[in-house]
């Protein structure tokens, strides 16, 4: 499988992210590292050390993946991430993009 098809099954804890769009305008442009994930929320540690909890459903996230030596940035709609992390790994994902 290609990298693009595995993104939704990837472990998110430890990844750097930026919120690129959200219905809560205060969250847009927030950057940090994912430190915990629940069914509906991501806990993000911002660069200043503060922790915030962000609902997955209302945001679009830009994750930074380190694939070998080339970092990749990928935008993911938070609605696709809803669910417990361990269940998301098992879930069948409809092909959304013709990669």
Curated annotation (Swiss-Prot):
Q: Name one GO molecular function term.
A: RNA binding
Q: Which reaction does it catalyse?
A: Endonucleolytic cleavage of RNA, removing 5'-extranucleotides from tRNA precursor
Q: Where in the cell is it found?
A: Cytoplasm
Major place of localization?
cytoplasm
Q: What are the EC numbers?
A: 3.1.26.5
Q: Which InterPro entries match?
A: RNase_P/MRP_Rpp29_sf (IPR036980), RNP1 (IPR023538), Rof/RNase_P-like (IPR023534), Rpp29/RNP1 (IPR002730)
Example GO CC term: the record gives: cytoplasm
Alphabetized UniProt keyword annotations: Cytoplasm, Endonuclease, Hydrolase, Nuclease, tRNA processing
Q: Which domain of life is it from?
A: Archaea
Q: Tell me, how does this one assemble?
A: Consists of a catalytic RNA component and at least 4-5 protein subunits.
So what does this one do? Part of ribonuclease P, a protein complex that generates mature tRNA molecules by cleaving their 5'-ends.
Homology family? Belongs to the eukaryotic/archaeal RNase P protein component 1 family.
Q: What is this protein called?
A: Ribonuclease P protein component 1
Q: Which gene codes for it?
A: rnp1
């Amino acid at each position: 499988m290609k990298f693009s098809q595995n993104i939704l099954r990837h472990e998110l804890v430890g990844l750097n992210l930026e919120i690129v769009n959200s219905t809560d305008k205060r969250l847009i442009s927030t950057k940090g590292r994912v430190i915990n994930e629940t069914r509906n929320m991501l806990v993000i540690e911002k660069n200043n050390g503060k922790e915030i909890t962000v609902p997955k459903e209302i945001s679009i996230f830009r994750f930074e993946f380190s694939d070998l030596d080339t970092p990749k940035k990928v935008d993911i709609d938070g609605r696709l991430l809803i669910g417990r992390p361990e269940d998301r790994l098992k879930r069948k994902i409809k092909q959304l993009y013709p990669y």
